[in-house]
Design a protein with these regions (language model features):
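Long, low-complexity, serine/threonine/proline-rich intrinsically disordered regulatory regions
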Residues: 1-78, 82, 120-267
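Forkhead-associated
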Residues: 76-79, 84-89, 93-127, 132
């Protein structure tokens, strides 16, 4: 891993090189509604509310979005979004949330999880509250640890080391989604979800947004680059004689290269 977060030069270069700092997608239940809302880097603050101004550069108004298949539950919930929320990034790449709505929002945030026992949770953020919901250094450390663990697993499998556990063998095939969760915030308006609610998943709530943060995604690309060049290795059964490898055809090699490619992030 040549990318060194400890050198602030790299952080500054990565952040300044980006035209956008986040992209926001709006959902009603499990349906994506409208177009992704892209926030320029120079707009340090973006507002997401329930009003109808379609022209705001740093204001995503959900009230003007139409959905011909809108559910009655969604119709009842949307007026209560009100003044919504405000997201702000600082010079260090951290992100802060302020709740302007009269109603609480319900948030999935790996950083807040780390402050509450490091277990996945749904965080209820009350009206008028303001707090940090994303920490760039924390996100980087988690993604780096995960990438190093995958690299170690692949090296052990490649070396055909005896006694590799099934967990270690499975670790080499960690998907991109497992990394990207450290680059994304998801929150629902008005209605809660999780173990304490009838709605267990955020996709069951009437109105919610997904915020993709571009600079941790850019860092993730750098972390995954060495893994792209190292195909996963199938575990060998050491109690059986190893079969000689058959020469690969060019067609098979192309197929494997496609499998090794990391899919791009969807907006």
């Amino acid at each position: 891993m040549n990318f060194n977060f400890a050198n602030i030069f790299y952080v500054v270069i990565f952040i300044l090189a980006l035209e956008l700092w986040c992209t926001i997608n709006y959902f009603e239940l499990n349906v994506h509604v409208g177009q992704p809302f892209k926030v320029p880097f120079e707009c340090t603050t973006v507002v997401v509310d329930g009003f109808t101004d379609p022209n705001g550069v740093a204001r995503f108004c959900l009230g003007c979005l139409s959905n011909v298949h809108r559910d009655e539950v969604v119709e009842r919930a949307r007026p209560h979004i009100g003044k919504g929320i405000e997201l702000r990034h600082d010079e260090g790449g951290d992100v802060w949330l302020k709740v302007n709505s009269e109603h609480s929002v319900f948030l999935e945030s790996p950083y807040l999880d780390s402050q509450c026992g490091d277990r996945p949770a749904v965080h209820k953020i009350y009206s008028s509250a303001e707090l940090k919901v994303f920490d760039l250094k924390y996100s980087y450390r988690k993604m780096l640890d995960q990438a190093q663990h995958v690299q170690l697993a692949r090296n052990m499998m490649k070396a055909n080391i005896h006694g590799v556990s099934p967990e270690m063998a499975a670790a080499q095939n960690v998907g991109v989604d497992d990394y990207q969760k450290h680059c994304v915030l998801r929150m629902s308006f008005v209605k809660g979800f999780g173990p304490d609610y009838n709605r267990k998943r955020i996709e069951d709530t009437p109105c919610w947004i997904e915020v993709k943060l571009h600079w941790p995604l850019k860092i993730l690309d750098q972390l995954l680059q060495p893994l792209d060049d190292a195909p996963s290795i199938q575990p060998q059964h050491h109690d059986q004689p190893q079969q000689p490898q058959q020469p690969e055809t060019k067609q098979e090699t192309k197929s494997e290269e496609k499998q090794d490619q990391v899919p791009t992030s969807s907006s």
